[in-house]
């Protein structure tokens, strides 16, 4: 139920809700990939962490290019995790 009376405003409300749900799903998926890398780092498994990191990079970069997150936020995630993986030895 929307408060809108104008047809175009009703349509925009529907589209906005649809987009909000899609974005929430994408954001959740991205966070899951990031958590997978953190889990591998915490376990001390360097090779598994590196492969999870490669997958995470693809997802984070895609979300940044689509505007779901800022490019700097994507860069921060990648550099922080890369440094932790490098530390594993």
UniProtKB/Swiss-Prot annotation:
GO cellular component terms given for this protein: cytosol; small ribosomal subunit
Gene Ontology biological-process annotations: translation
GO MF entry, a single one: small ribosomal subunit rRNA binding
Disordered: region residues: 1-29
Keywords for the protein's UniProt record, in alphabetical order: Ribonucleoprotein, Ribosomal protein, RNA-binding, rRNA-binding
Pfam family, one: Ribosomal_S20p
Function noted in UniProt: Binds directly to 16S ribosomal RNA.
Family per record: Belongs to the bacterial ribosomal protein bS20 family.
Protein name per UniProt: Small ribosomal subunit protein bS20
Species in which this protein is naturally found: Haemophilus influenzae (strain 86-028NP)
Source species taxonomy: Bacteria, Pseudomonadati, Pseudomonadota, Gammaproteobacteria, Pasteurellales
């Amino acid at each position: 139920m929307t408060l809108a009376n104008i047809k175009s405003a009703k349509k925009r409300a529907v589209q906005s809700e649809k987009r909000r749900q899609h974005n929430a799903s994408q954001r959740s998926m991205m966070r899951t990939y990031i958590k997978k890398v953190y889990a591998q780092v915490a376990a001390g498994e360097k090779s598994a962490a590196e492969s999870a990191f490669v997958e995470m990079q693809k997802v984070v970069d895609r979300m940044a290019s689509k505007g779901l997150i800022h490019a700097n936020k994507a860069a921060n995630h990648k550099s922080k995790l890369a440094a932790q993986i490098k530390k594993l030895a």
